[in-house]
Amino acid sequence: MEDFVRQCFNPMIVELAEKAMKEYGEDPKLETNKFAAICTHLEVCFMYSDFHFIDERGESIIVESSDPNALLKHRFEIIEGRDRTMAWTVVNSICNTTGVEKPKFLPDLYDYKENRFIEVGVTRREVHIYYLEKANKIKSEKTHIHIFSFTGEEMATKEDYTLDEESRARIKTRLYTIRQEMASRGLWDSFRQSERGEETIEERFEITGTMRRLADQSLPPNFSSLENFRAYVDGFEPNGCIEGKLSQMSKEVNARIEPFLKTTPRPLRLPDGPPCSQRSKFLLMDALKLSIEDPSHEGEGIPLYDAIKCMKTFFGWKEPNIVKPHEKGINPNYLLAWKQVLAELQDIENEEKIPKTKNMKKTSQLKWALGENMAPEKVDFEDCKDVSDLKQYDSDEPERRSPASWIQSEFNKACELTDSSWIELDEIGEDVAPIEHIASMRRNYFTAEVSHCRATEYIMKGVYINTALLNASCAAMDDFQLIPMISKCRTKEGRRKTNLYGFIIKGRSHLRNDTDVVNFVSMEFSLTDPRLEPHKWEKYCVLEIGDMLLRTAIGQVSRPMFLYVRTNGTSKIKMKWGMEMRRCLLQSLQQIESMIEAESSVKEKDMTKEFFENKSETWPIGESPKGVEEGSIGKVCRTLLAKSVFNSLYASPQLEGFSAESRKLLLIVQALRDNLEPGTFNLGGLYEAIEECLINDPWVLLNASWFNSFLTHALK
C-alpha cells in the first residue's frame, strides 16, 4: 500500500500527509491505510478549490489555464494540509475579517463566495452515515458539509453542492480511479474495511417525497432539517443528570424526578367484564389423541393414510349432536361439516386407491364456515378517490375481558411431563463449528429435561399444523383441503407412535401478502365437557360425537367424546413463525445456560454437571400469590420452555406492548430491591401504557396477574 500511495499521489501531497501523521505520532509505514486515506482527502480538498476564482465583480468563475490576469482571487482558502498553528491562524483571520462564527474544529476550506467554512469528507462507507458522524462531531449549523464516496455518491448540507457538476464529476472520477487502482493490486478490501465505525453501520432509510416534507415540518423547534435533528439526537450523550439532560432538550420540559419507594407502585388494574376465552389455533390441555403404535401400514407417513388408520382405532362413534352452541354462528352448519368429513373419509376408503390429499366438496355449510364470498368486494383506489366521505369502517372497541383461571391451568399443564418423548436428542440442531464438550453436554441435559414436556408436544403439533397448512395454502389455493392434525412421538419403551388430534379444512388461500388471511375450520377431539367452563369455549361449537372407554383404577368407564369445532384464520407470516416454533427450545436453553454461567463464574469452574445432577437443590421458578415458587432444575427448564411456547401460541400486539412496557416497571422495582434508589417521572404514564395492553387476551392477563404477585412479594 505504501508503494501505491507514493506512486499514485503527487509528491507534495504525500509529503503533507507524512507531516500530518507525524504530528499525531502515527507512522505512515505502519498505518498504510490511514496514509492512503489522508492523501485521498488532501487531494480532494485541492481539487475542490482548483480553477475556482472570484472576479472583480465578486462573481465565481472557473479558469483552467494560468491566466496572467492577476485581478482574480481564489474562491477557496485551503485550511487542510497546513500545520495546526498555521491553520488556526488562517481560520481566526477569516473570522475576524468576515464576522463568520468561529468553528470548534478545524474545517478543510473556506468559501469566499458563500462566506462559509466547508468540511469535506471522503468515505468508504455509506455517505449518509459518514455525513451524520461529521454533523454530530462538529454540531454547528454554520459549517457546510460535503461528503464524497468512492462509489460516486455524494451528500451535502441542505443538498447544496457548492460546486458545478463538472468540478464534482472530476473529483468522483478521481476517487473511482483510486478505487480501481487499489482493487487491481488487491488493496481495496483492506482499505474499505479499515474505516473507523464499520462495525456500527446502521442502515439509514432514504426518506423522500411527502414523508420527507412531513418529517421536515414536524421537527422540534430550532431545527432546520431532519438531517441536523438526526445528528443532534445521535450526538446526545445519555449519561449524566436526567434533569440537566431534559432542560438541554427543551425549555418546555420540566420533569420532577419523584423517588420510587416501596409504597410507590400500585398493582396493575386488570379489566372487568366476562372471563376471557380460549383463542389458540388448536386445543392444548383439552386435546384428545387417537393413536397407532408402531405404524407400519401401507402409505405410512402420508398424513391422510395415517389419519384414516388412527380413526379406525376408535369404535365408539355415535350420531353427533350439539352440546354447546356457538353464540353467533349457524350451529347446524358445524354439525353438517363434521358429518361431511366422516362421509368423505368413508368415500375414500371405498375407493380402489386412497389419494394422498383430500379436497372437500364445496357444500353450503363449508362455504359458510370458511367465509366464502363473504369478503367485501375490492374496489380500485382510482375509482373511488373522488368520493368525498371515503373512510375506513368503524370498528368496535374490543370488549374488555377479565382474567380466568383456565389459562393458569393451561400453563401448569404445559409444564408437566407426558409419558412420551416428543423430540429426538438432535432436535436442537448440531452446531456447525466443532462444538465444545460443555455445550453439547448442556444441550443433552436440557433435552432430557424437556423432551417429555407437554410444551414440547405443543411445539411439534404447532410445527406440523402450520407446515401442513402453509403447504396446502400454496399448493391448493382454491380447494377446501382436508388436513389431518397429526403428531409423532415415542413411547417409554421407545416405540414410535402416530397421533391424530382432529382435522382442519382450509378455505380459499390466494395469499399474496404476508398478512393475507386464510380461513380454516378446525375440528378437534376432546374429553373435556364444555359446559364446565362455557366462557372458555365462547368461540367454539361443541358436538358430542362418541363414547370412549377409559381404563381407570376402578376398571373401565365410558366417557363422552366431544368435537370442538370453530372457524379460525391465519396468515403466511403467522404460519412461518408457527413452523419455527422449535426456536422456543433454543430460547429456553439459552436462558438456562445463562443461569449456569452465573453459577460457574461464582464457583470459577463449569457447573453444568452439578447444576443438572444435584437433585436436592431448588431454584426460583416464578411468583404466585403464595410467594416465590421453587422447583427442581427440570421444572425450571420446563417452565421457561412453557413460557416461550405460550409467547408463540398466544402471540399478539397486546403481548408485545405488555412485555415492552411492563419490563420498564420491572427494572425500576428491581433497582429498588437492589437499593439503587431509583427515581421516576410520569410513572402514571407508564402505568397507562402497560394497562392499555390489558384488554382481553388470556395470556397477557395471566402475565399481568403474575406481575401483580411479583409486586406484592418484591415490595414486602
UniProtKB/Swiss-Prot annotation:
Pfam families: Flu_PA
Entry annotated with the keyword Ligase: no
Keyword field contains Glycoprotein: no
Entry EC no(s): 3.1.-.-
Record text on cofactor binding: Binds 2 manganese ions per subunit.
UniProt main location, coarse: host cell
CC cofactor: Mn(2+)
Function as written in the Swiss-Prot or TrEMBL entry: Plays an essential role in viral RNA transcription and replication by forming the heterotrimeric polymerase complex together with PB1 and PB2 subunits. The complex transcribes viral mRNAs by using a unique mechanism called cap-snatching. It consists in the hijacking and cleavage of host capped pre-mRNAs. These short capped RNAs are then used as primers for viral mRNAs. The PB2 subunit is responsible for the binding of the 5' cap of cellular pre-mRNAs which are subsequently cleaved after 10-13 nucleotides by the PA subunit that carries the endonuclease activity.
Family classification: Belongs to the influenza viruses PA family.
Name of the protein: Polymerase acidic protein
Name of the gene: PA
